[in-house]
Amino acid sequence: MAKSGMGTFHTGARIENVVDRDKGASIPRLLVDTGSEYTWVPATTLEKLGIAREKKDLAFIMANGQQITRSVGFAIVRVAKAFTVDEVVFAEKGDLLLLGARSLEGLNLTVDSRKKKLVAAGPLPAASMIQCADATAI
């Protein structure tokens, strides 16, 4: 995982077609961004992998306040040994390439901001039980 500016760092990832996992591409530098819900991958890469634009003209607010629209599709996102299926944004020229919070959650990875790297988030929480007045679990 490559380090970059203050408090930020990049990581590499592999993006794969959900239906045909043989169709995949490595993305060497994604900015790890817990403030972004989605992972942003070059549209040209997603198109080459045969990933369909499932949601079109989805509105996004950029960090500078500008509103833009992009398409979103489904892909397998792999970082090291972890993987998840997630929605990915078809990033256009000039867009930052990002590894977003939803992918991080699905990968069960969290940010170690001191060491500027991704680390395992630990055991996943299971359902919790709440006791009701009649002692049945919900």
For each predicted feature, which ranges?
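Pepsin/retropepsin-fold aspartyl endopeptidases
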Residues: M1-I138
